[in-house]
Amino acid sequence: VFFTGLIDAAYSGASSVVGPAVWGIGGGAPLLAALVFVSVIFFSSLFAVLHHTGVVRIVVGAMARAMAKTMGLSGAESTSAAANIFVGQTEAPLLIRPYLPKMTTSEIGAVMTVGFATVAGTVFGVYVTMMKDVMPGIAGHLLAASVMSAPAGLAIAKVVFPETDKPETLGKDI
């Protein structure tokens, strides 16, 4: 309900800028490009504000510590996995950028696997927008799926790429 309310507010603001015809008000179908662009811009802006205020760091840090302790992961791969739940595959590795050159093959495999397993926040918004009329509780289902996919992706990555070296960030908070 919270995410759908945010998206509805974004669309009502955007319709006042570009006009109601783009949104299908008055009988036409809404333009897919308009739906996608508004979702991408809105969620990018929302995550930028949350990152600037430190909310993202707190939430991602707590999740990363929990994953590192329960799954025996290094700080870099658990931080990237936790960030992948909220941001995309291109943004999450930027949080661990200084550690990338020294990461083991297993850690890099885990970062890539979790990136493919989770849904980026902007894409999350697009999916909710497209599916909210067909499946009213879609936001909760997608969020639960993304949260469950991070540890599942890590487990699969460790089976495919077992850790043979000692990671530099093992036991460290990033």
Where would I find each of the regions flagged by the language model?
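Alpha-helical transmembrane segments
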Residues: V38-S44, G137-I156
